């Protein structure tokens, strides 16, 4: 496949932005101009290139709206929102390495995206706030315009680095046109809850989704006109969002689950990228944390991708050192301490996918392990899809093949939620 950048990381993230083009989140020429202004592995040039395109698209949206052209305004605002997201993507704002640009850029995404909501032609959209412990989770509810009967609901979960405004370009742009209500939200460690509210990540996503389902029940009672069919609720997520979806699927109120390119055990992921001998010695107490921190700090100094990945994990876990991050990663597993799998609690149909050209995961050690742990469902209620080439969904999270993953997801959901067209 054609490469835009020497860096695998920058190349993947650029394709990620291009992937939003069919759904209004990018314009090809704008992206190519930005690419020409970006220096490989230079986060500052990445930021500058995308902020220029974001500001231009925002100005085009304002101009179109002023002249009454709501179609062009919607398209421009969607692009601007995605470009603002991209402009801040390489930055973190953790206590040990603060960056004052992070929150203002996140707010620009929110403000610009809010301008698109009344202009969307894919259905109705509204902003919600979901009570969760001592906080409120920001959410969007996307509804089909034609709701003569109750509609099934899809909960679209973000992952480690996505924000819910980006999720629009996947399921929220298509779901309402196919007769689904789609709810996106940001839980602990995600999006604005991390950047503004300083909520850090947690592994027990069944608790988070459980509160969301409680909220939807109350919301439906107070707003019956939304016509949500809470007997037909599905959950979908990609990468870490795929892990979250599998955790959430243990809730009996979930009627179907689509887990795109998940991991089974985050610690196994670490062992595939860091010397297992070193990790075992450290975990056994034979090698002190300061030594491991020093080794990982050298790796971060030598590679921007490593610096970004470890820095992001420290940020969303709320810790200050690589070894503290490793301790947190051990908690993110579908295995119980006794060796059994949490997936034995899942009773709903599950579609799980893998990507052989993933930037991060190995399908054989993750997706097949998930699929095998779902054997109790029987082959009629579990499905596996391992994609090998980029156009078939072979990149992580099916980046570059959004239309295909949307088609396969809703085909699976239609079948198991009894949706007919």
UniProtKB/Swiss-Prot annotation:
The top EC class is hydrolase
Disulfide bridge map: none
Description of the deletion phenotype:
Impairs the productin of oxaleimides and leads to the accumulation of a trans-decalin containing alcohol intermediate.
Coiled-coil spans are: none
Q: In which pathway does it act?
A: Secondary metabolite biosynthesis
**Keywords for this entry?**
Hydrolase
An example GO biological process term is:
monocarboxylic acid biosynthetic process
| Highest taxon above the source species | Eukaryota
The Gene Ontology terms for molecular function here are: hydrolase activity
Induction info reads: Expression is positively regulated by the oxaleimides biosynthesis cluster-specific transcription factor poxB.
Query: What InterPro entries does this protein's entry cite?
Result: AB_hydrolase_fold, FrsA-like, FrsA_esterase
Subunit structure comment from the entry = Homodimer.
Physiological role: Hydrolyase; part of the gene cluster that mediates the biosynthesis of oxaleimides, cytotoxic compounds containing an unusual disubstituted succinimide moiety. The first step of the pathway is provided by the HR-PKS poxF that serves in a new mode of collaborative biosynthesis with the PKS-NRPS poxE, by providing the olefin containing amino acid substrate via the synthesis of an ACP-bound dec-4-enoate.
**Family the UniProt entry places it in:** Belongs to the AB hydrolase superfamily. FUS2 hydrolase family.
Protein's recorded name: Hydrolyase poxO
Taxonomy of origin reads: Eukaryota, Fungi, Dikarya, Ascomycota, Pezizomycotina
What would be the name of the gene that encodes this protein? poxO
